[in-house]
């Protein structure tokens, strides 16, 4: 019983560490720069493409 509890805690800790690593990696891909809007509205795909071209990462539109 004691070893199965230890194994369960080990698995839990490893999964938490891996999930935090994946969240940190996803946040690194966000573009820190705002992309100016060239039209009356912001299409998310256009902003994402512009930021990829300019900075190599995913971005968001400026207001």
Curated annotation (Swiss-Prot):
Which species does the entry assign this protein to?
Brassica napus
**Tissue-specificity statement:** Pollen specific.
The name on file for this protein is: Protein BP4A
């Amino acid at each position: 019983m004691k070893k199965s509890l230890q194994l369960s805690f080990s698995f839990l800790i490893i999964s938490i560490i891996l999930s935090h690593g994946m969240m940190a990696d996803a946040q690194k891909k966000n573009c820190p720069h705002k992309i100016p809007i060239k039209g009356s509205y912001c299409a998310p795909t256009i902003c994402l493409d512009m930021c990829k071209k300019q900075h190599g990462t995913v971005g968001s539109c400026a207001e």
